[in-house]
Amino acid sequence: MTKPPLTLYLAAPRGFCAGVDRAIKIVELALDKWGAPVYVRHEIVHNKFVVDGLRAKGAIFVEELSECPDDRPVIFSAHGVPKSVPTAAQARNLVYVDATCPLVSKVHIEAQRHADNGLQMIMIGHAGHPETVGTMGQLPEGEVLLVETPEDVATVKVRDPAKLAYVTQTTLSVDDTADVVHALQQRFPLIVGPHKEDICYATTNRQEAVKAMAPKCDAMLVVGAPNSSNSRRLVEVGARAGCQYAQLVQRATDIDWRALDGISSIGITAGASAPEVLINEVIAAFDAHYDVTQEVVETAVENVEFKVPRVLREPA
């Protein structure tokens, strides 16, 4: 039986970003240096395949520092942690390595700087996401106000409208965030923003690639985890950019082939914490069902690399 033809558009950039790559390397190098087990507070990155792979090598994932023993190293996830976490680790004399993405750390420093200058902080982010919790936890409880939507901006209660600054989560929708920033600037004309956009280069680049790809596609799949903020945003961006069917899949086994019946083109991308092996698995699944012609939609070239902490570059 002849397979139906399918044009498969592959977004570039896609998949791993520099912060995720660094965080995974940190866990692997810590296991090399100190042996198993190494404890990791929260999933190092939001991807089950990656976490399961590290668990098999001897990483133990916990949600709280209190679950870590005193005599084993602990790593903080790429999303960042409240200031209270390293303080508690120091009080227990724990060996710890902070795998917070440097671009998240930049937001932490920004929030602290604005607070030191007497400005009240507003954070644009998703409630409960570990990155939001970590950034808000850089300052005393109640000092950072959280807004998610322009509607939230209308009701937020501030101390002094003339003394405000905002930061954002790094993995948000660029367009949605622009709407929230606009609402903040309309209501609080004196609000201070970041010197450089807080939404990171990788989030922005992956969304731009999807915007370029989506209008060409009958359907689009984003390889990523349901708890990955940046992956979920890619699905939303694809739908908004005109793709009729945009769906999140963790692996090829999640593909709903019935929903794709009759398509002649598909777009494939992946969130920043999804490894290339899972993307290749999805492409192989389409190769098995269709006569595939592959086209790359490239909107940016990435060559960012972040060094791992010095403690892991030194011999044991």
Swiss-Prot record:
What EC number(s) would the UniProt record show? 1.17.7.4
Sites binding (2E)-4-hydroxy-3-methylbut-2-enyl diphosphate sit at: H46, H79, H129, T170, S228, S229, N230, S273
The active site annotation covers: E131
Entry's Gene Ontology BP terms: dimethylallyl diphosphate biosynthetic process; isopentenyl diphosphate biosynthetic process, methylerythritol 4-phosphate pathway; terpenoid biosynthetic process
Binding, isopentenyl diphosphate: H46, H79, H129, S228, S229, N230, S273
Record function comment: Catalyzes the conversion of 1-hydroxy-2-methyl-2-(E)-butenyl 4-diphosphate (HMBPP) into a mixture of isopentenyl diphosphate (IPP) and dimethylallyl diphosphate (DMAPP). Acts in the terminal step of the DOXP/MEP pathway for isoprenoid precursor biosynthesis.
Name of the molecule in the record: 4-hydroxy-3-methylbut-2-enyl diphosphate reductase
Species for this entry: Roseobacter denitrificans (strain ATCC 33942 / OCh 114)
Q: What is the lineage of its organism?
A: Bacteria, Pseudomonadati, Pseudomonadota, Alphaproteobacteria, Rhodobacterales
